[in-house]
Amino acid sequence: MPRLVLVSFLFLAIFSVFIGGFAKSKCPRNEIFTRCHAACQPSCARLARKPFCIKICKPGCICTSGYLRNKNNVCVPRSRCFSGRLL
């Protein structure tokens, strides 16, 4: 039984590293891969206020510098966040 647990753990660890390598190349346009980012990424909705956010080490894609997530979760230039309306 302990051997099965060890083999299962090793398989999951290797699989996680293997899958993690593919995540880097699958980021959408205007996003980059990072191994550790905050749970609440900068967004157009949060631009006017600074929310309390706990930084967790979560790998994934984040908006590149100068871009924020819009209501459709797409990274857009900061200038497009409020097009057509005032702050």
From Swiss-Prot:
**Record localization:** Secreted
InterPro entries referenced in this protein's UniProt entry, alphabetically: Ser_inhib-like_sf, SerProtInhib-TIL_Domain, TIL_dom
Q: Does the keyword Disulfide bond apply?
A: yes
The alphabetized list of GO BP terms reads:
defense response to bacterium; defense response to fungus; killing of cells of another organism
The record lists its disulfide bonds as C27-C61, C36-C57, C40-C53, C44-C81, C63-C75
Return the Gene3D superfamilies for the record: Laminin
Alphabetized UniProt keyword annotations = Antibiotic, Antimicrobial, Disulfide bond, Fungicide, Hemostasis impairing toxin, Protease inhibitor, Secreted, Serine protease inhibitor, Signal, Toxin
TIL domain residues are 27-81
What is the protein's major site of localization? secreted
Q: What role is this protein assigned?
A: Antifibrinolytic and antimicrobial serine protease inhibitor. Inhibits trypsin, plasmin and microbial serine proteases but not chymotrypsin, thrombin and elastase. Inhibits the plasmin-mediated degradation of fibrin to fibrin degradation products. Also binds to bacterial and fungal surfaces and exhibits antimicrobial activity against fungi as well as Gram-positive and Gram-negative bacteria.
Q: What is this protein called?
A: Venom serine protease inhibitor
